[in-house]
From Swiss-Prot:
It is found in: Membrane. Residues 49-68, 143-153, 223-251, 304-329 are cytoplasmic. This is Taste receptor type 2 member 134. PANTHER family: TASTE RECEPTOR TYPE 2, TASTE RECEPTOR TYPE 2 MEMBER 134. Belongs to the G-protein coupled receptor T2R family. It comes from the Eukaryota. Its main location: membrane. Expressed in tongue and gastrointestinal tract. It comes from Rattus norvegicus (Rat). The gene is Tas2r134.
Amino acid sequence: MRCSLRGCVQGRGGKSGVSLSKFSPKKMSFFFIFMVIFCIQSLVALLQNGFLATVLGREWVRSQGLPAGDMIVACLAASRFCLHGVAIVNNFLTFVKLWSQKIYFSVLWDFVNTVNFWCTTWLAIFYCVKISSFSHPIFFWIKWRISRSVPRLLLGSLVIGGLSAVSSATGNTIAFQMTACENYTLAYRTRAFYAYYFRCHAMLMWIIPFFLFLLSVILLMFSLYRHLEHMRYRRPWSHDYSTQAHTMALKSLAFFLVFYTSYVLFLVISVTRVVNVHSSWHWAWEVITYMGILLHSTILTLSNPKMRKALKIKFPDLCVARSQDKRRG
């Protein structure tokens, strides 16, 4: 999934793909249970992000434009829809040992995942700049320009994703051709070189946007917390709507941070090949990795006013039942 040629090099270098014959019955049942969970999880993610992208995309076409924040969310949802789709294809190509076909989808995964990273980063920066109450002149300058810069930032994400895909495709092609020969010493050295190459590639493409995301979310949480404490100091016995809204925003940001960070950490750990494609834990690892980004998208969906309105229209009975439960509570 993440390491584009990791399984492919192993497959051409003398090892087979995921062989079920080596698993005990207990491990085999474990293997298939998590495979089914991964498929269900991916289907939920596809429906969720597809719904989010469709609603905002339709609004974009209808009104000939979107607010800058919704524009980023629409592009982020589209990239995650593609990411989950490509991840499903990649994993099943690995399962049936179609290594040469997997290379092309792995390059596509690199492109989509890089775009996803940068769109998430732009969203965090946008909300940080728009909502935070810092008084530094540079902050005011960014706040004044950020909305007009969003289309260019999104275009930049596509360019960076394209560069990532070119880099990945180049490394894949060289390594795959070198391992096609019968020289196993060369194949081993090629795997070692590619592992080092891909780790550097992944760290460059993932860590930079994640650091900006982390910084933006922490600054925003600090600003909201400071403002909340100021309101509580001025009105210590008041629990008005504004205080509740700030508290809910802080909780949402905390979950936002935890879920997305878990996705990034599992990706980074996977580069070290803690769990490879031949392991019975492979599907369990995939479930855990993509769970973070699925929950992250859920928060985006539920915190967006347009999405809440669309959900009420699409599922009125569910919303009525939920409101009745709240009244009873």
